[in-house]
Design a protein with these regions (language model features):
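Acidic, metal-coordinating catalytic segment for phosphate/diphosphate chemistry
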Residues: 1-44
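Short loop segments at secondary-structure junctions
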Residues: 12, 41-45, 56, 124-129, ...
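Conserved Nudix-box catalytic region and its N-terminal flanking loop in Nudix hydrolases
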Residues: 21-34, 46-86
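Nudix hydrolase/Nudix homology domain
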Residues: 64-66, 70, 76, 103-108, ...
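A short coil-to-beta-strand element that immediately follows conserved catalytic motifs
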Residues: 95-104
């Protein structure tokens, strides 16, 4: 399990050397980061499916909602890629091959108590075993690209964790390119 210190960041997205923060240290002026990994697989029609995780009912944020395949905060001293690899292992029991993890971008997000950068990755799934390990996920579900595109238009209607429009635009541009490559 990762430590309770999160890596602190400068406003330009560069980590602050030697500065880790606990949840109680967070203020409106602090910036931390989260790594998001979206798993996708080639569908039978040549497009792509996206793996969603239903958050467990006992988690603090967005219980019962569908969300990113695996995600979590960047721990002190970790890189965003390290955090992505760790979270995939912790949440869905999958060891990612770093050569197949593709970084698609980072976006700032202002929260009510603090700010964070979201480092977004995609990963092509090839049938490796999946297992909801740490109790944060209650279910896993593969969703076709077109269905996911519809879900993000009305996230509350389908209990999908809402993200910024720019976030979904970044993700859907990359997944759309993959889906058209068939």
């Amino acid at each position: 399990m990762h430590n309770d210190l999160w890596q602190s960041y400068h406003p330009n997205g560069v980590p602050k050397q030697g500065e880790g923060l606990t949840r109680k240290d967070l203020t409106k002026d602090t910036i931390v980061a989260a790594a998001h990994v979206w798993l996708w697989r080639r569908s039978s029609d040549g497009g792509c499916d996206i793996l969603l995780q239903r958050r467990a009912d006992q988690v603090k944020n967005w219980p019962g909602y569908w969300d990113i395949s695996a995600a979590g905060h960047v721990s002190f001293g970790e890189t965003p890629l390290d955090a992505a690899l760790r979270e995939a292992q912790e949440e869905i029991g999958m060891t990612l091959d770093t050569s197949r993890v593709k970084f698609i971008g980072s976006l700032p997000k202002r929260k009510s108590a603090y700010s964070e950068f979201h480092f977004v990755y995609i990963y092509e799934y090839h049938g490796e075993p999946l297992d909801m390990v740490d109790g944060e996920a209650a279910a896993l579900r593969w969703v076709p690209y077109d269905t996911f595109r519809q879900m993000i238009e009305q996230p509350e209607d389908v209990m999908l964790v809402p993200h910024q429009p720019l976030y979904f635009a970044l993700l859907m541009e990359e997944l759309g390119r993959i889906s058209r490559e068939s």
